[in-house]
Amino acid sequence: MATPGPRDIPLLPGSPRRLSPQAGSRGGQGPKHGQQCLKMPGPRAPGLQGGSNRDPGQPCGGESTRSSSVINNYLDANEPVSLEARLSRMHFHDSQRKVDYVLAYHYRKRGVHLAQGFPGHSLAIVSNGETGKEPHAGGPGDIELGPLDALEEERKEQREEFEHNLMEAGLELEKDLENKSQGSIFVRIHAPWQVLAREAEFLKIKVPTKKEMYEIKAGGSIAKKFSAALQKLSSHLQPRVPEHSNNKMKNLSYPFSREKMYLYNIQEKDTFFDNATRSRIVHEILKRTACSRANNTMGINSLIANNIYEAAYPLHDGEYDSPEDDMNDRKLLYQEWARYGVFYKFQPIDLIRKYFGEKIGLYFAWLGLYTSFLIPSSVIGVIVFLYGCATIEEDIPSREMCDQQNAFTMCPLCDKSCDYWNLSSACGTAQASHLFDNPATVFFSIFMALWATMFLENWKRLQMRLGYFWDLTGIEEEEERAQEHSRPEYETKVREKMLKESNQSAVQKLETNTTECGDEDDEDKLTWKDRFPGYLMNFASILFMIALTFSIVFGVIVYRITTAAALSLNKATRSNVRVTVTATAVIINLVVILILDEIYGAVAKWLTKIEVPKTEQTFEERLILKAFLLKFVNAYSPIFYVAFFKGRFVGRPGSYVYVFDGYRMEECAPGGCLMELCIQLSIIMLGKQLIQNNIFEIGVPKLKKLFRKLKDETEAGETDSAHSKHPEQWDLDYSLEPYTGLTPEYMEMIIQFGFVTLFVASFPLAPVFALLNNVIEVRLDAKKFVTELRRPDAVRTKDIGIWFDILSGIGKFSVISNAFVIAITSDFIPRLVYQYSYSHNGTLHGFVNHTLSFFNVSQLKEGTQPENSQFDQEVQFCRFKDYREPPWAPNPYEFSKQYWFILSARLAFVIIFQNLVMFLSVLVDWMIPDIPTDISDQIKKEKSLLVDFFLKEEHEKLKLMDEPALRSPGGGDRSRSRAASSAPSGQSQLGSMMSSGSQHTNV
């Protein structure tokens, strides 16, 4: 058999072969049976769809390939590369066709010996009918290609079939030559105009029409003046990008149709679809292209999951830090958005959406709105804190506790080692508690509940506004199409089920010699019986993880109790026991939370995988719910303990509650547990944000990038030096971190939203710290997306999905939690009850004495009395904080009437507070419409403009059709008949136009 020519290299290698650069000719025989050539469809007429017109039985080699485009495995290494291609790094080797998508895979060979003189840098080019170049003959040596192992051979064949199917779909491919023992190969994909037009029509992508841009006007004159004034005042805060400067102008868009090309503003076909749209179209083709050799696997995601390919990604628009003057969207985003130096500027949301797609654009729009809403809450929180600082000297309970003339002798804090003590020694704790436990925090809690409602309502309005500007109305069909693509794991499970059932049915047929008809619908999908083991494992695992979290919290409680007891034995450390124990316990909680966060994230992903959800959207929603549940319990369990349980199960002097045979349960400080709750919140919130942002989001990606760089440099030893000095854009993007979704970004902000809203009554400065963190977080995420991640696929979506429901749930739950914090944890209700029910003069004078009960020290249990007491005077009665009957009462140490009165007042406050805030939240929700009035009016206006524009274009089309007919004899009759034949078509198009407009109206 003659060796194939350089233009006819078979892609399915058989046995080891020896390829000579000079061997073969175009007129030689084709490859044997079983070998196959990847071909590109030749040039087609503009009206034809993309695809291959090759006869399936036609051989790959010989004369039959002259007019077809096949992979060229040899390229002259000495041929100078064009300057334009090197500068752009975004095109095929011909410097004409743009790279819309890249597939990457890693290969390895056995026993490969490179002879001298063989070019080190070569390409395998799928051209478009161009003449192939002769192979380089720089040396006499040949290349001995050793056989691949069975797995590599199978993967190679699957890749070749998949790439062939891509070209059958009309795509054009270019790939590297495997000229090393191992390395990475990049398959560049270009979508020609015919493919773009066909897929854009199938996907119903909205594109600009010839209609000029029209202005989106404000609702009224006052709103218009206010908007103009605000725009003028914030001019220096606006990013200098074209998309942001035209944010009040909108194109009239209509779904693309090849039959209505006259409607669109097509100035140049190569630039009509932007890069994000082109890559989105190619990605849709990749998702639905099948590969029969890989068990009929559907789509690129399945091939990546089976390690056939290593990565698939669209290219970035050049480098972001290039010194050249040429500007691209990536460089513009870096200069005006992804740098810490522009933290004060607004985000260029339209440019973000254009570059990354609607899904990522909505995330940054939500993050920007959330950050801006933190500004008023931060201001109010600072005012509340300053109010506490200003009134600390006027707080009567604090003054009474600090007054040394009030000889309140308190009971020992521990057994044996602790002595009696004066309440005035806790003066600092009482004053610090007043900073956060004052009447202003109640009103701040109500404000924050309404703030959460207003934030969600404004987000719905902003979401609708962005959906209108970004042409997201009527996107339901796209979301339904997304549901049609099954996950690779789901397909694998279905195939395993069908194979198992077919084997069982074959055995039954042999045994019974009968034919049974089963339910075919159940065979090609997973039923609840198939999923039941996964559901059971999920339920048991989640319960175990929650129990593990509670066990760790209990372990920290035991640590606090035992450490406090141990430190109390030493006289030198006895005075700082509470501070030491609290600080170390909070740090332990923080470390455990950070560790469990990473573990729970991996566990949630594993649990979701064994459920085998069918679609990516279902997988993402279930993953979010599991991860949020586990991380919510992990982050807030220690805080809930301090807020609602600490000090509630202590007992009383003479009848304390003990754990582990001798350790007393811990109790709150004299000023209450609110101060400790504040410390717990601040350390966990700040530590979580600082450590996760600086270590996990900055440090870990940099280490991964460094590791990949070292690995690439190690493998690049066999690569041509000129190639390594001038890496192409696909090489640069391949070294970046792969994009894994927005779940970690949303999760971090959702947990922070919980810190801001759930316990704001005890920590009014939480919005301030959240604001400072988010100012950095916006730029950190922006820099990560622009500089450190591969470019994500542009995904269209109309909202933020399940995250909105989680936010709404947290907002409602925060009302209940803050009501209980105010009623139970703080002293707000006891002070209120005392002032209006027990005080003689309507003030808080005598409140401290009212909250302290008496205990007869002679009734202390044997062995618990203070040893070597150095108290100045003999103690007969000591005081402890509780509402109990005195020793001389008929029922000593039982709960007093004041206790039950205050308890009923606490519960009444919870009910009143919850219903009041819920009513106000519903009122705010009702007052703020979900759809802005101006957007609702503009939707109607756009519908009218679109119909008028369509009728005008149809009239112009008919006019052009009638002109040549009028010039010819008998043209009048022909023109009338032609107009009559065109009328139904125009009417049907107008009907589709009206139905499209009705979709806008329903929104």
From Swiss-Prot:
Catalytic reaction(s) noted: chloride(in) = chloride(out)
InterPro entries: Anoct_dimer (IPR032394), Anoctamin (IPR007632), Anoctamin_TM (IPR049452)
Feature: compositional bias, Low complexity: 10-21, 978-1003
Annotated GO biological process: chloride transmembrane transport; monoatomic ion transmembrane transport
GO cellular component, one term: chloride channel complex
Glycosylated residue positions: N422, N841, N849, N856
UniProt motif (DLG4 binding (PDZ)) ranges: 1001-1003
Principal cellular location given in the protein's record: membrane
Keywords: Calcium, Cell membrane, Chloride, Chloride channel, Glycoprotein, Ion channel, Ion transport, Membrane, Transmembrane, Transmembrane helix, Transport
Disulfide pairings: none
Subunit annotation: Homodimer. Component of a presynaptic protein complex recruited to specialized plasma membrane domains of photoreceptors. Interacts with DLG4 by its C-terminal region.
The name this protein goes by in its record: Anoctamin-2
Gene behind this protein: ANO2
